[in-house]
A protein has these predicted regions:
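Substrate-binding/catalytic subdomain of NAD(P)-dependent oxidoreductase enzymes
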Residues: 1-76, 82
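Catalytic, metal-anchored helix/loop core of enzyme active sites in primary metabolism
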Residues: 42, 52-56, 60-126
């Protein structure tokens, strides 16, 4: 709701994928809790929905989390415990991955996976 969880995930991805050394304080965060009733009505009137989107544009040094109005059919509009990520590639264009991202089992699995990745990275000297 406040965007902190999404910002933390953005920091982890940025440091892992682009070998950056960013901190949570480097992310501009606007939580979905800051939305007004007018913004919610506007999205509804346009047959859209509002989702909290974490965005990284490394070549511009942009790291931000903010609510966005998206068409209900947009690939990032997922429900319940699903998370989605869209990666903009040079050769294939946009690629969207969707999977479970919330809940106690999913969180535990992700933590274990992250710890194994970190262990393997240190073992290789990365």
């Amino acid at each position: 709701v406040k965007g902190i969880d999404a910002a933390i995930k953005l920091v982890i991805l940025s440091n892992t994928i682009w070998k950056r050394n960013v901190k949570l304080s480097d992310v501009t965060i606007t939580g979905i809790d800051m939305l007004t009733n007018d913004a919610l009505r506007l999205a509804e009137d346009q047959h859209c929905t509002i989702r909290l989107i974490a965005e990284a544009i490394p070549e511009k040094g942009i790291l931000r989390v903010a609510p966005r109005i998206l068409p209900r059919t947009h690939p990032l509009v997922v429900e319940n415990t699903l998370n989605a990520i869209t990666i903009d590639t040079d050769m294939a264009g946009e690629i969207t991955l969707i999977g479970k991202g919330a809940g106690s089992r999913e969180t535990a699995s992700a933590c274990i996976g992250d710890l194994l990745f970190i262990k393997d990275s240190h073992a290789r000297g990365n």
